[in-house]
C-alpha cells in the first residue's frame, strides 16, 4: 500500500500546489471493491475555503481519470485538516511541539499501541511524548496514525 500511497501523492501534489494550496497529506484505503481517497489540503495565511476544496476535487478527479491509478470505483474526499488535524510527516510533528497529540502505533511499544500526551519534541527521528509523569521516545516509523488533540 505504501507504493500506491507514494504514487497517489506524486500525482496529486503538483495539482494541489498549482491551486495555491499545500497537500497536507492523504489517506488511501480499500474496502471490498471500493476505494476511498481522502485528501487534506492547507492554505496560508487564511486557511482553506470550501471553494478551495471544490477546485482541488475537480482538478484531482480529472487527473485520476486520465492517469487511472485507482482501479474500480472510488470515493474522493477533499477537506482541510481541521482542528484535530492528522500528522503525516515528521515535519508536521515539529510544527506541533507543545500541543497534545494522540498516536496509534503499528505494533505495541512497551505493551501499548495507543498514546495521548504532550508532544515535547523530536530527537533523532523519534517523537518525544509526555504521558502523565512518563516520557516516551516513540520511533516515527512505528506510528500508524497521529492527530492533534484540540484543547478548549
UniProtKB/Swiss-Prot annotation:
Highest taxon in the source lineage: Bacteria
GO annotation, biological process: ribosomal small subunit assembly; translation
UniProt key word tRNA processing: no
CDD domains: YlxS_C
Keywords on record: Cytoplasm, Ribosome biogenesis
Coiled-coil regions listed in the entry: none
Gene Ontology CC terms, in alphabetical order: cytosol
Compartment annotation: Cytoplasm
Main location: cytoplasm
InterPro entries, sorted: Ribosome_maturation_RimP, RimP_C, RimP_C_sf, RimP_N, RimP_N_sf
Stored HAMAP family: RimP
Main function: Required for maturation of 30S ribosomal subunits.
UniProt similarity note: Belongs to the RimP family.
Protein name as it appears in the record: Ribosome maturation factor RimP
Amino acid at each position: 500500500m505504501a507504493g500506491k500511497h507514494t504514487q497517489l501523492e506524486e500525482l496529486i501534489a503538483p495539482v494541489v500546489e498549482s491551486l495555491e494550496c499545500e497537500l497536507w497529506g492523504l489517506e488511501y484505503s480499500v474496502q471490498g471493491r471500493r476505494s476511498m481517497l481522502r485528501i487534506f489540503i492547507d492554505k496560508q495565511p487564511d486557511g482553506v475555503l470550501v471553494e478551495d476544496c471544490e477546485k482541488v476535487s475537480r482538478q484531482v478527479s480529472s487527473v485520476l481519470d486520465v492517469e487511472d491509478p485507482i482501479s474500480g470505483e472510488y470515493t474522493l474526499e477533499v477537506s482541510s485538516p481541521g482542528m484535530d488535524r492528522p500528522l503525516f510527516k515528521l515535519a508536521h510533528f515539529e510544527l506541533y511541539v507543545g500541543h497534545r497529540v494522540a498516536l496509534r502505533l503499528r505494533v505495541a511499544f512497551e505493551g501499548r499501541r495507543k498514546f495521548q500526551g504532550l508532544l515535547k519534541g523530536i530527537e533523532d527521528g523519534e517523537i518525544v511524548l509526555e504521558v502523565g509523569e512518563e516520557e516516551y521516545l516513540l520511533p516515527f516509523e512505528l506510528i500508524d496514525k497521529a492527530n492533534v488533540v484540540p484543547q478548549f
